[in-house]
Every structure is written in structure tokens, then in C-alpha cells.
């Protein structure tokens, strides 16, 4: 597993280098390889990253809404939108990442595809819509187009290629895992509901989250079930 994580870190680094190389080549081809254009390219790069971050988490949110999930927390960098008792609360805490936490309904089969793939589809749509920037026939909009598309492709691949980062599965890994069996889907849904309770520091009755589970020889298929047991054990 550590080997796989190392490979993915290398792949992510390659994506970043390719993005930078693409931008540099464009600046050079336009005879704009200057400190001024370079500085603005960095600003547009950060803007593109922010847009794709917002799009990715919003994609998860929309996928969750379509699937009947209930919002717990939607975070865009330092801004968090928390939904508690049908009331929205804004919180600010420094962060450069995003997160969308939602809890599913008590229905079978568990609806998970739209929620987990929503972020990837959102990044793809943003990358496609970025082609409209070429209509302006401007150096700066062309530069923004290149950055939006290159970052979008990187985001899609990083989230779609199944892998774990520090033991945490990405979207592609989660989708692959949930397709294996109904038991894993039940574990996943139960884990999200339990995590939602934990997020709000609400009282948790262990008996509501204890159920019979056939042990799988595949450790990954037991991932969410084991997470549930770890949380319940920590509450004792």
C-alpha cells in the first residue's frame, strides 16, 4: 500500500510539472515569457485551482442532493457551510482543501454513484466549458483556458484513478469499492451516518450501528465496517 501511495505522489508531481511546462511553452510561443506574465500566470493558476475546487465539491453536493443525501458540511478552502437542524452556519478556518460531507437516507439499495462521482463530472464540465474562453481571442483568456483545462484534466485523473492517500480512499477508489457488494454499501452508508453524528458531537447509541457482517477476506471490503468499529470503540 505504501508503494501505491508513493507511486501516486509521483504521478501527482508529474501532473503539476506538466501543467507548469504547458504554461511555460504557451508563454514562450506567445513571446510573453516575462516576469510580469509569469506572475499573472501564477495568479490565474491559483484562480483555476480555486474554481476547480469549488466545482468539485459542488459536484459532490449536487450528486448527494440528487441521491437524497442530507448535507452535513460543505467546505471550500477556509469557508465551511454547515447544515444543522435545517439551518446553515458559515465558519472560517484556514485550509487549502475542500470537503463535502453528506449522510444518505435509510434506503436499499444505497445510492452512491452520483454522490461519489459528482466531483469528477463537475471538473470535466468546467474543463469543457473553458473552451468558451477561446471565443474572446485574447492572450489572457487563452492562458486561462490552458490552465483551466490542464488543471481540470489533472483533477479528473487524480480523483478517478483509484488510490489511497494516508489510508483515505479517493473518489475512484470509493466507487470501485462500493461496486463490489451490497454489504460494503451498507457499511459505507452506516459509516456516513455515524460520522455525521460525530461531526455534530451528538449523542450516539452504539446499538444503532451494530449489525451482523460476514467477514470478507478482502481487507478493503471491510474498510468502512472497521472504521465504524473503531469509532464505537473510541466512545466507550
Model region roles, listed by residue range:
Residues 192, 228-229, 233:
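"A position-specific structural signal for the A-helix of alpha-solenoid helical repeats
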Residues 211-221:
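Solenoid-like repeat scaffolds
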Residues 34-55, 142-157:
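Membrane-embedded alpha-helical segments that form the functional core of polytopic membrane enzymes
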Residues 43-105:
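Small-residue-rich helix-interface/hinge motifs
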Residues 1-45:
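Topogenic membrane-insertion module of multi-pass membrane proteins
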Amino acid at each position: 500500500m505504501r508503494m501505491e501511495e508513493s507511486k501516486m505522489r509521483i504521478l501527482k508531481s508529474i501532473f503539476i510539472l506538466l501543467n507548469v511546462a504547458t504554461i511555460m511553452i504557451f508563454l514562450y510561443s506567445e513571446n510573453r515569457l516575462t516576469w510580469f506574465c509569469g506572475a499573472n500566470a501564477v495568479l490565474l493558476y491559483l484562480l483555476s485551482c480555486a474554481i476547480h475546487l469549488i466545482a468539485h465539491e459542488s459536484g459532490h453536493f449536487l450528486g448527494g442532493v440528487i441521491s437524497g443525501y442530507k448535507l452535513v458540511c460543505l467546505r471550500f478552502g477556509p469557508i465551511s457551510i454547515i447544515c444543522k437542524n435545517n439551518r446553515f452556519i458559515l465558519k472560517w478556518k484556514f485550509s487549502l482543501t475542500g470537503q463535502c460531507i453528506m449522510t444518505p437516507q435509510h434506503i436499499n439499495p444505497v445510492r452512491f454513484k452520483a454522490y461519489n462521482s459528482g466531483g469528477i463530472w463537475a471538473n470535466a464540465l468546467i474543463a469543457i466549458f473553458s473552451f468558451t474562453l477561446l471565443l474572446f481571442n485574447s492572450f489572457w483568456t487563452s492562458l486561462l483556458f490552458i490552465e483551466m483545462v490542464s488543471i481540470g484534466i489533472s483533477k479528473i485523473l487524480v480523483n478517478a484513478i483509484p488510490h489511497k492517500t494516508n489510508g483515505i480512499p479517493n473518489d475512484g477508489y470509493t466507487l470501485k469499492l462500493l461496486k463490489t457488494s451490497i454489504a460494503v454499501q451498507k457499511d459505507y452508508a452506516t459509516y456516513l451516518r455515524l460520522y455525521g453524528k460525530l461531526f455534530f458531537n451528538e449523542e450516539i447509541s452504539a446499538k444503532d450501528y451494530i449489525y451482523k457482517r460476514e467477514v470478507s477476506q478482502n481487507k478493503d471490503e471491510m474498510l468502512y465496517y472497521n472504521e465504524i468499529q473503531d469509532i464505537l470503540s473510541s466512545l466507550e
